[in-house]
Amino acid sequence: MEKLLFYTKMNFGIEATGGIKNKVLAQKKAFEDLGFEVDFFYFENKVIKIESKQSILEHKTESKFAFLKYLFGGFLNDISIEDYSCMYVRHFLTNPMFIFLLYSIKKRNPQIKIFMEIPTFPYQFEFNYFSLIKRLELKSDLFSANYFKKYIDKIVTFSSKELIYGIPTIRTDNGIDTDKFGIIDPPAPFNGKEIHLLGLANMQKWHGLDRVIEGLSTYNKISKNIKVYFHLVGRGDELQNLIDLVDKHKLSEYVLVHGFLSGKALETMFSTCHVGIGSLGMHRINAAKGETSALKSREFASRGMPFVIGYQDRGFPEKYPFIFDVIADETPIDIDSIITFYKVTSAIPNFNKTMNLYAQEHLTWRAKLENVANNFRDK
């Protein structure tokens, strides 16, 4: 069985990274299902871990210097990199230390195939909304990317690019663990008087949830028979701006902020909401035209919840009846149209089961990574 080192510079000790953690663990499981023996590299705060089927190697660091030294090469003293035929790297803001790590790996094991996942490309637009420190890290990443071609064999991307940094790409899109994100059955009951929208995200500007709040403000200025409630679930840099917008429009009765939810609390939220709100602001980072595939859309599909998006997602057929597409611009969302969309889709017999079945057949990580596995095995 071929050995694969799955390398991610992600702190799984932070609760708010739960969504990304779920994705990475599902990818790891998919590679195992596809016949690889996977060793998983990650960290929890100051403890760096390499997890195999048989054991977990833990290395606790006491200083930032010691942490970086081990993260970007020190761990090679504790494993036999020569035993691995493949390495899968989840992209992060790289730096010259990472390039040195790749150099060290290739020097000790020239035959190893290294693939890096860069989901969205170009990704630089995402950092226009981040802190100065993050923007400086981006500059370091752009410098380091000049050396990717020397050590990285393929880029795995959800974009349409055939080459990234001069490296051939493998095109796929986001998948999901349909066992973990199971169907909500029965779906939330609709009494004809209330509709509940679910905005579940790591709150960032490109999710465009402000467009729903602006739409609710317009909607509530006219007397309506159906009350619409918007539930915000998650944390992130944009959350305070959304709260301020709610206060500005005096919508605290209709926009409910729940913070981070998981487990039974999240299941309950899904079972009481009718429509999922996907990403509505991808145009803000130049990623609305088939260049991305949001995890959240796949979760809504697996859960059996009709949803709204503002970008092209090639993971779904063009006339998929359970997606409501809105224009990718800054206009407020028309709440009346969402109500109509929900009434039409919820009238389809067993709509939630139909959505879940599509997810099981087309959106699993095993299906999405099969081509990656084949490329690893190509001689």
Predicted regions span which residues?
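Nucleotide-activated donor-binding/catalytic signature segment of Leloir-type glycosyltransferases, i.e.
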Residues: 243-270, 275
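Membrane-proximal helix-turn-helix segments that form the acceptor-binding/catalytic region
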Residues: 97-108, 116, 122-126, 132-155
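A conserved mid-protein helix/loop that constitutes part of the nucleotide-sugar donor-binding site
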Residues: 22, 26, 204-220, 240
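Nucleotide-sugar-dependent
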Residues: 18, 207, 264-266, 277-301, ...
